[in-house]
Amino acid sequence: MIRRIDMALHVQEICALNDIKVRYQSMDEIEPRYWANPNKREIQIRPTKNTGYYVSALHEIGHIIGDNQDLDRLGQELWAWIYARQTALVWTPTAERIMQDSMKSYDWQERDKNVWRLYSETMV
């Protein structure tokens, strides 16, 4: 079983190894506001208190060091999630739901879903 501390340390290690500055959003703020600035090699995430926050942090890291970040916005989002899936120590139904909800907000299409499915099948 992966513990919260393992997930938090994993995010910190990736950021340290890749010279990514991390800003932590206050937990007092109700609405999560994650973002990545590849030019500044900086991300904003919530403290890694659960799997959802963990995979969201990995997704933001994916915008900086993941593949295909030169695509259109939808492609960038998809490939940042692929990076998160590839890198995660654990991928749970919660992680999958968060990814699906995020991609729905970008109106992903069947071709994008097929890329995700193909990729996910290789991770099993």
Language-model features: where?
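A short, highly charged nucleic-acid-interacting micro-segment common to nuclease
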Residues: 1-6, 84
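Long, well-structured alpha-helical subdomains associated
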Residues: 6, 14, 48-49, 89-124
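Catalytic zinc-binding patch centered on the HExxH motif and its immediate surroundings
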Residues: 12-44, 51
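Short, conserved micro-motifs enriched in small and acidic residues
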Residues: 52, 56, 74-75
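Active-site recognition of the HExxH zinc-binding catalytic motif
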Residues: 55-68
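Short, structured beta-strand-loop surface elements
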Residues: 70-72
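An active-site-proximal "capping" alpha-helix that borders the catalytic cofactor pocket
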Residues: 74-89
